[in-house]
């Protein structure tokens, strides 16, 4: 059987970091994942997926990723159940993350936070990353105006040189 999940989305809130009685770190958060299609009104909808992550990964996530952070998650789907105060059985399905990766630079995250706050939209505000002298001007420019092979000479390859 295969139970493997790969998700890319944005955190809808800061992760809630807690510790079990045996001192195991566990963090929970919700990831907003856009659907690949548009609805009848031409708008993209999103699924809000509950994520649980354990141990050192949980502590790292709580320290580095904040509301609005674009994350890549790998893990598995798990369903658990419990009995609520009314005596009813409640089923909860969530993704147990094995790994996560932040998919944008700190400068991008800070820029989003600033632009959303300036525009009056606080959807992704609250990133507590310190800039400490970093600025957008220090971001390398990866655009190329010329061919990286422009100064090289063409190779002479005959049919006899090819192994097939």
Curated annotation (Swiss-Prot):
Any one annotated GO CC term: nucleoid
Alphabetical GO biological process terms: DNA recombination; DNA repair; DNA replication
InterPro entries reported for this sequence: NA-bd_OB-fold (IPR012340), Primosome_PriB/ssb (IPR000424), ssDNA-bd (IPR011344)
Biased composition (Low complexity): 111-138
Domain of life of the source: Bacteria
Molecular function GO terms recorded: single-stranded DNA binding
Keywords: DNA damage, DNA recombination, DNA repair, DNA replication, DNA-binding
CDD domains recorded: SSB_OBF
Keyword Transmembrane annotated: no
Region (Disordered): 111-164
Domain SSB: 1-104
Sequence motif Important for interaction with partner proteins, location on chain: 159-164
Xref: HAMAP family: SSB (MF_00984)
Function: Plays an important role in DNA replication, recombination and repair. Binds to ssDNA and to an array of partner proteins to recruit them to their sites of action during DNA metabolism.
Quaternary structure note: Homotetramer.
The protein, known as: Single-stranded DNA-binding protein
Species this chain originates from: Streptococcus mutans serotype c (strain ATCC 700610 / UA159)
Origin organism lineage: Bacteria, Bacillati, Bacillota, Bacilli, Lactobacillales
């Amino acid at each position: 059987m295969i139970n493997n999940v790969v998700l890319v989305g944005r955190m809808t809130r800061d992760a809630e970091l807690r510790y079990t009685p045996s001192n195991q770190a566990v963090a929970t958060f919700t990831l907003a994942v856009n659907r690949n299609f548009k609805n009848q009104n031409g708008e993209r909808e999103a699924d809000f997926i509950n994520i649980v992550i354990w141990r050192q990964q949980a502590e790292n996530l709580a320290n580095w990723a904040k509301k609005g952070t674009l994350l890549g998650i790998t893990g598995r789907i798990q369903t658990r159940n419990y009995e609520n105060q009314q005596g009813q059985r409640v089923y909860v399905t969530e993704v147990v993350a094995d790994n996560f990766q932040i998919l944008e630079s700190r400068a991008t995250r800070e820029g989003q936070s600033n632009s959303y706050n300036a525009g009056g939209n606080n959807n992704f505000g609250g990133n507590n990353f310190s800039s400490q002298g970093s600025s957008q001007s220090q971001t390398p420019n990866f655009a190329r105006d010329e061919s990286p092979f422009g100064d090289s000479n063409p190779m002479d390859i005959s049919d006899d040189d090819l192994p097939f």
